[in-house]
């Protein structure tokens, strides 16, 4: 009987995790961004492990990360590892980007406030590729609304961006300044340096193709 109960609990856990991952990621590929699949080349990965291991403190003290650096240095993968690891612990995480959020807001049948409130209900919100969205007045206003609502919810936020810390600390105008100020107040900046993993992956694919064509 105990074995049956344990198996049932295990099944329930797996169903819960599967559901969290289905609802939490905008792209199914993100489910593969795990510590187990890590290539070991990102020196910052121990900071991701630290975040997951100390999740209760991070949540209570509203500590987020601002992951910045050049394209392809592993920022999104790093954030995905945190998301997957917390989902495995049955913590609801939403990992999305502002292009998707702005599309959702335009197409959404529910009100704008309700949509943003729903985003802010997730214990952890991850915004990938911040700064890549269209910089219209409407777009910037919605970006601010989401960041500000998250700030007021006192729940942590993790952001990945190709923008430099200098450009975030010295914005060009007021519209960007109020967004960046909020981000820097909520998130500890972490610089990603090193080789471009995407370029390396592309090179590996090319080498494999050459092998196959021999």
Which residue ranges define each predicted feature?
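Pre-Walker A adenine-sensing motif
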Residues: 47-59
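Short glycine-rich substrate-engagement loop in P-loop NTPases that contacts/grips substrate
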Residues: 44-49, 83-124, 134-141
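Walker A/P-loop nucleotide-binding motif
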Residues: 59-79
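Catalytic acidic motif of RecA-like/P-loop NTPases
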Residues: 72, 131-132
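Residue-level preference for the first positions of well-ordered beta-strands
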Residues: 62-66, 93, 124, 156
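A short, basic N-terminal segment
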Residues: 1-45, 200-214
């Amino acid at each position: 009987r105990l074995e049956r109960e344990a198996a049932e609990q295990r099944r329930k856990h797996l169903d819960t995790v599967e559901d969290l991952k289905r609802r939490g990621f905008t792209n199914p590929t993100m489910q593969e961004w795990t510590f187990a699949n890590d290539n070991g080349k990102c020196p910052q990965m121990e900071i991701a492990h630290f975040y997951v291991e100390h999740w209760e403190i991070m949540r209570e003290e509203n500590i987020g990360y601002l992951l910045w650096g050049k394209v392809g240095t592993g920022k999104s993968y790093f954030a995905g590892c945190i998301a997957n690891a917390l989902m495995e612990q049955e913590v609801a995480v939403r990992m999305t980007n502002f292009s998707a959020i702005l599309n959702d807001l335009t197409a959404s049948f529910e009100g704008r406030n309700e949509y943003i409130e729903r985003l802010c209900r997730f214990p952890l919100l991850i915004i990938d590729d911040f700064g890549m969205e269209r910089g219209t007045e409407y777009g910037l206003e919605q970006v601010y609304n989401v960041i500000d609502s998250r700030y007021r919810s006192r729940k942590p936020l993790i952001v990945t961006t190709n923008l430099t810390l200098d450009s975030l600390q010295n914005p060009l105008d007021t519209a960007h300044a109020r967004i960046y100020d909020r981000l820097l107040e909520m998130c500890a900046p972490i610089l990603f340096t090193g080789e471009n993993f995407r370029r390396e992956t592309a090179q590996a694919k090319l080498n494999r193709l050459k092998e196959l064509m021999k």
